[in-house]
Amino acid sequence: MDRLSQLPTLRITPTKKLTLTYRGKNYQGVAGDTLATALYANGIRIFSRSIKYHRPRGLYSLNGESGNCLMEVDATPNIRTEQTPLRNGMIVVPQNVIGTPEWDFMGIMDMFHWAMPAGFYYKIFHKPYWLWPFFMGIIRKAAGIGRINPSRREGRSDELYLNCEVCVVGGGPAGISAALTAAGKGLRVILLEARPWLGGFYDYRTIEYTKGVPLYKRAVQLVEQVEDTPDVRIFPHTSLIGFYNNNLITARQKGHEKDSFDERYIEIRAQSVVVATGCTERPLIFENNERPGVMQIGCAHRLAQTYGLLPGKYAVFSVGHDLGLEAAIDLSGLGLNVLCVADSRSDGQDPELLEKLTKINIPVLKGWVASKAHGKKHIKKVTLSAIEGTKHKDFLCDLLVASTGLTNARSPIFLTQAKMVHDPDSGLFVPKKLPNKVYVAGRFLGFHDPLSIETSGELAGLAAAIDCGVSAKSQAKEVKRRLEDMPGPIRASQFTRIPGRGAHDFICFDEDVTIQHIHQAYEMGFDNAELAKRFTAAGTGPTQGGISGHNLPLVISQYNADSDGSIVPTTVRPPLTPTLLGTYAGRNPNPYKQTPLHETQKNSGAVFHRMGVWKRARYFSKDYSARDEIENVRNNVGLIDVSTLGKFRVFGPDSVKALERVYVGDMSSIPEGKVKYSAMCNDDGCLIDDGVITRRGVNDYYLTTSTGRSGVTVEWIRYHTRYDGWDFHIVNLTEVYGAINLAGPRAREVFQKITDTNLSNEAFPFMGYREFTLKDTVPVRVMRLGFVGELSYEIHIPASYTQTVWEWLLGAGEEFGICPFGLEAQNALRLEKGHVIIGQESEIRTTLHDLGLGFLLYRKKHEANTVGVFALKNTEYQQGRLKLVGFKMDSPLKTPHDGSVVVDSEIRGYICTARYSYTLGESIGLALVESHLAKKGTQLEIFDAGAGNKRLYAKVVSTSFYDAEGKRLRM
């Protein structure tokens, strides 16, 4: 399509070509285009198919009030293409079609519209009940518009938190005037505008502002002034998300191509707020009013003046306000063949505009409206009808510009809990009373005259400044007096539609809701707009009432024969603008801690996994089954990085008392050179951590905790000893020391090669602790433990030497087949041994007794007041608690997923960990089950989502599946 390239109002650069891919085919647009205008320029007229009937939908508005132009863009679904700037290389895919938008197989649904009356989904499909799962699957597949694309790249998000004296919402003439006025009083002002540029509805209009100055030039003047005002911070392409108490505003800004973000979340705390969001158009309701080729006045006008695209060749206008007459004159002058202008008003038109239409031979039919658009995929003919009488006229055309009135963009004010009432003169919903320090201005109040619009903005800016402590009451009175002498709000048409059957007269494009549906709902008793909205789903689609928000209350009021005062709009809730969850999350720098061995493991092919604040090696194998790692530890020797374990030194005269307070075991009996396994509980006796403690000297202890508790252990101990006045100190050494667990039957042989210390079973037994040096150089602290069920040495090394020791061990173990192993292998190995992991075999209600760890409780330390001991004693024999059991699957190759539930007629427990054991050749696991199922030999019935309706079966066994006597730990 040829562009109108010489217009002074253009926002495009016709010489700068950009490419996009649509349905696998390359198209060209130009810089400044939106995706929708670029596609329109390339002859695309059907942009989508409707959600229920799969009717063709085309470009209708450029403001995002309808879901007609939702598409998948660069793997992101539900993008409003009419508001999305074109960027080079964009990949666009249509949504909600089987086939193509032009030939959609599901278009057959339109033939069965009679079978889908209002609320049909509430009344069928649930009887007989056993058919519901079948229908549910079909409905879920059919529902929705866009689909999540797993290949979508992660978006770039940002966040900004601001405060100001005055926040102005809306960058049109009223908003700019308010911002300039407030800034002129020395206040900091933030100006938000949804479009990529300022100017509002002045921006594309050529009608005169004053003699010799068209409106678009006045827009340029205002924009230059506000951009040159240092106290005004402007955020273009920024849409409101929410408006909350005490003037807290949230917004979403779309990033420019050169910005470092795709979307930015903005939160603003303002002393005063001015809302100058202007008006949108109220759709005319008639048969096939959503066919491609039907569009709003502003859409047709801006296509030409802003993007250089004539919206059609032969056009008919059906309007209800003077902007429609103005657009018809303007577009006719640009080359559009305007066949006729139908105006729903019988009088009240601007005589100057009527005279211009007469001069250019465009007939005007007063008291007429469009009653039907003809054509299956695009309009080919329009029928106009007299509102009073039975006269009809047909016009062959490819464009119908239709709008019956204006409605203010009231959603931001609605969120402030302001009571909105219907004004019968302006036809708008206006606030009866505004919250403190909130003001409205401009077309929002129904002003149409440019000077009135700007003056109302000036008045709102002064009122906001006065709220901020500025002395300007006398000036505000003068401005108010001037405004009263200017043209006030114009009288608007209340017309919605010509009475008829209404089967294809759409009131809500998003949800395929027709006038017939609204009437059906009304007859069933849903006799107010809010109830009708819920029952028919009108206004609940992607645009949340954008198209239907004003007409629905008017239609219901007509059924009720209500007076204007009882016309109530439907509720508006945030977010006002669809916003990615990633945008709410803000920047995603993904901060994490890494161990001293991170790069070394990375170079060895480790696949990492986020564990709390750390990144740890999940596996080194070809897949996460880690079979080779498991078998190597069982048969030879392996090493794992355990630097993330919490490491603490507790020392001082009262250190034992402090440890006794938080650990359930007897801390006073720990000898030097030995380690003790113990646990911490909360006040309810529920397990929160486990670890080992050793005594290094008199009143000097070294202890380890789980990775998850390493960051809070100091605070936990301090909190529970805060009133005792004890003399002790605690030092967090977690990041001071790295740690390596060397495990396997050949571990002693490997370790002995890098130290002269005697590592024999007699000199360094199981659960022993030693401090010595490696190669006479590196001091280490070593514990002989057995978490994975093999001979193991947990080596704690000064962090800067950890990589060196890792390399020494790999070198020393080369002849024994040493290999690193990760968390997946460790998880399987410890499961075979029956060792628990806090948070995996436990949850917040799980006690020591539930896990079979009651032996850790030392019952004779009466004066220690240990956290959780009282609860542990009282719950030891409590009925109805879940108990930890081991189980083996009846079918060795069937392994339930973690989190699967144990059932009979009800849920009786859940699977904590289950794996296929390559060591044992069968599937094993640990589960928490009700006590009557905890006896060995009991059969468990398991529901696993991956098994469908089939049940899996297992038998309860000991929790120790491998080396129950512990011989391999002590070898």
Q: Which positions does each model-derived feature cover?
A:
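Conserved, structured C-terminal
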Residues: 598, 602-603, 616, 697-971
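Residues forming the flavin
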Residues: 2-590, 736
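A short, contiguous, amphipathic alpha-helix enriched in charged residues
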Residues: 35-47, 648, 653-670, 749, ...
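Structural motif
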Residues: 22, 73, 611, 683, ...
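Short amphipathic beta-strand starts and helix->beta connectors
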Residues: 425, 490-493, 628-635, 680-690, ...
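Short beta-strand segments
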Residues: 25-27, 78-79, 266-268, 393-395, ...
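Residues forming anionic-ligand binding surfaces in small-molecule and nucleic-acid pockets
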Residues: 279, 526, 627-643, 687-700, ...
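Acidic, proline/glycine-enriched N-terminal capping motif
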Residues: 532-535, 551, 558-681, 686
